[in-house]
């Protein structure tokens, strides 16, 4: 466990979202942009993505998290927060690194939206082919 006044910062990214996570020892309160997690992310799937690093490392209820997240949508933001929490947990205890790494939580998911190409309607969708 960590001392009272120490904190660990982790920056997570997913798609265009960037999350800064500040972990302190506590009782499991998670505040995202000044709101509790239940108010900020209403769907259970997104909350499960966010809490996954803590569930895997069995640190639920041991840390409080204050999170600032910018950019992206709901899925990108929840992924960025999970990545940030995983990085902060790794800084708090080196023994957790193996568990986080084996579950793929320290790897930055670099899948982003593919750019639109000229002559196409979207990234890959071509206009309808006409024979004559």
Curated annotation (Swiss-Prot):
PROSITE patterns: RIBOSOMAL_S9. GO terms for molecular function: RNA binding; structural constituent of ribosome. InterPro entries: Ribosomal_Su5_D2-typ_SF, Ribosomal_uS9, Ribosomal_uS9_bac/plastid, Ribosomal_uS9_CS, Ribsml_uS5_D2-typ_fold_subgr. Pfam families: Ribosomal_S9. Residues 100-132 are annotated as: Disordered. Transmembrane segments: none annotated. It comes from the Bacteria. GO terms for cellular component: cytosolic small ribosomal subunit. GO terms for biological process: translation. Residues 114-132 have a biased composition (Basic residues). Gene3D superfamilies: 3.30.230.10. Keywords: Ribonucleoprotein, Ribosomal protein. Disulfide bonds: none annotated. Belongs to the universal ribosomal protein uS9 family. This is Small ribosomal subunit protein uS9.
């Amino acid at each position: 466990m960590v001392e009272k006044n120490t904190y660990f910062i982790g920056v997570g990214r997913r798609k265009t979202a960037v999350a800064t996570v500040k972990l302190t020892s506590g009782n499991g309160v998670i505040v995202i942009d000044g709101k509790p997690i239940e108010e900020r992310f209403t769907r259970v799937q997104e909350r499960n993505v966010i809490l996954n690093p803590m569930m895997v490392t069995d640190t639920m209820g041991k840390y409080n998290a204050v999170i600032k997240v910018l950019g992206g949508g709901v899925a990108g933001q929840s992924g960025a927060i999970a990545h940030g929490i995983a990085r902060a947990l790794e800084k708090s205890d080196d023994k957790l690194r193996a568990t986080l790494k084996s579950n793929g939580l320290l790897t930055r998911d670099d899948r982003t939206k593919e750019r639109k190409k000229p002559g196409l309607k979207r990234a890959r969708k071509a206009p309808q082919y006409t024979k004559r």
